[in-house]
Amino acid sequence: MLEKLKKEVLSANLELVKQNLVIFTWGNVSGIDRDKRIVAIKPSGVPYEKLQCKDIVLVDLEGHVIEGSLRPSSDTPTHLELYKNFKEISGVCHTHSKFATIWAQINKAIPCLGTTHADYFYGEIPVTEKLSAKEFENYEESIGKSIVEKFKNINPLNVPGALVSDHGPFTWGETPLKSVENAAVLEYIAELAFFCELSKAQGQEIDINLLDKHFFRKHGKDAYYGQSKNI
């Protein structure tokens, strides 16, 4: 069932290792079939080197397992909240990549300090509010809700990622692989911003006109970066 989607999700999860975004069994990627309302996601605690297509778990949007003999990722409720609220996305990625997690642990949004950031994220990468003790009871679902709440006035396609307070980054995209690409870029710009903050000449936030130029030359109806079709 949904073999093509499972293969895409497997490939995206293995890409986490190639991009040095995960260690051990940390991290997960999912994808969704919007027509069937079924999500394919990495199983919980399975080493990447042992992960096979048959291991990818299928769940519905309420978290019920549709297919698979393994438990789905413990982060599944977070993924489901994002799919239910961000209708334009078809892939979600979660890592504990080093520099992005540093920003999450100090509970600070990543400011847009230059054009490398602006090429992918239209403005700062926000950090969610801290969860209350009551919210810990449904921890992973509460994480998803906290991201959705933070994006009430933010287009999730313009800022395809967030930092979860005290925890780490989640990213998303039009495909599972795109969510991983956004995770890799987030980690890179998190490192740049980290060292800018450490430097004596602290970076200033990017001029709004330069932000507009770099983001919209790659995204939107008037984009002109790259080729008109894939090569």
Task: Give the label of every model feature segment.
Residues 1-231:
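Glycine-rich flexible loops
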